[in-house]
Curated annotation (Swiss-Prot):
This is S-adenosylmethionine decarboxylase proenzyme. It comes from Salmonella paratyphi A (strain AKU_12601). GO terms for biological process: spermidine biosynthetic process. The record marks 111-112 as: Cleavage (non-hydrolytic). It is an enzyme of class 4 (lyase). SUPFAM superfamilies: S-adenosylmethionine decarboxylase (SSF56276). Is synthesized initially as an inactive proenzyme. Formation of the active enzyme involves a self-maturation process in which the active site pyruvoyl group is generated from an internal serine residue via an autocatalytic post-translational modification. Two non-identical subunits are generated from the proenzyme in this reaction, and the pyruvate is formed at the N-terminus of the alpha chain, which is derived from the carboxyl end of the proenzyme.
């Protein structure tokens, strides 16, 4: 896309929001409580603050304020307000390609924020536990928050990921013409690295005329030991392993498709 000469500040708002899910099987009530305590500590407010602060570094934002909170019995949230970092617009890369993991990227932000909320969850029947992290990166300026996508997914356990990206508002060029988007985008997948794309099955649902983009990701490889908490698959019978595998796959597909699936 040809670079635009704008009248004043770039007023477009670009919002990236996504849910990241980690799935686990805990055989007993004690193991379920242990998993919730483990994941709650692993992603406490301090750790999340470190992740989001590094995200600010990746996209070149200045941190204005940090609000963080750990909740009882579980969960945490962090919100960071960020400000613009003046840069030469000629140095900003507007092309569609994966962001860094974290190499330096320059951004131009104003009235922007980055926030995360966590939701550990379990049920006494079935042994299934889930951890969900809701993340939103919203920026005003010339660069898309999609540049931070690779880093954030790699930092969190990601069996399933749902991503939404939207550009809102408009900005004017020097001739008074309104522009409702200032960069080319066909798919969120174009901002992911090849190694990440090779790990997931993905599907897009995009509304191009509204500048709304949606991608869902489901981990391809399934290794049962990755999903067991304090239990080894080899300590289970073959029937138990098959039942647990079926339950985990059903849980993952239901989250991925966003609907309950009847047992076969």
């Amino acid at each position: 896309m040809k670079k635009l000469k704008l009248h004043g500040f770039n007023n477009l708002t670009k919002s990236l929001s996504f849910c990241i899910y980690d799935i686990c099987y805990a055989k007993t009530a004690e193991e379920r409580d242990g998993y919730i305590a483990y994941i709650d500590e692993l992603y406490n407010a301090n750790r999340l603050t470190e992740i989001l602060s590094e995200t600010c570094s990746i996209i070149g934002a200045n941190i204005l304020n940090i609000a963080r909170q750990d909740y009882e019995p579980q969960g945490a949230s962090v919100t960071i307000l960020v400000s613009e970092e003046p840069v030469d617009p000629k140095l900003i890369d507007q092309t569609e390609h994966p962001g860094p993991l974290p190499e330096t990227v320059v951004a131009h932000l104003d009235k922007s924020h980055i926030c995360v909320h966590t939701y550990p969850e379990s049920h006494p029947e079935g042994g299934l536990c889930t951890f969900r992290a809701d993340i939103e990166v919203s920026t005003c300026g010339v660069i898309s928050p999609l540049k931070a996508l690779n880093y954030l997914i790699h930092q969190l356990e990601s069996d399933i990921v749902t991503i939404d990206y939207r550009v809102r508002g408009f900005t004017r060029d020097v001739n008074g013409m309104k522009h409702f988007i200032d960069h080319e985008i066909n798919s969120i997948q174009n901002f992911m690295s090849e190694d990440m794309k090779s790990l997931y099955d993905m599907v897009d649902v995009n509304v191009y005329q509204e500048n709304i983009f949606h991608t869902k990701m489901l981990l391809k490889e399934f290794d049962l030991k990755h999903y067991m908490f304090h239990t080894k698959p080899e300590d289970l019978t073959e029937t138990e392993r098959q039942q647990i595998t079926a339950a985990l796959w059903k849980e993952m597909r239901e989250i991925y498709y966003g609907r309950n699936i009847s047992a076969v």
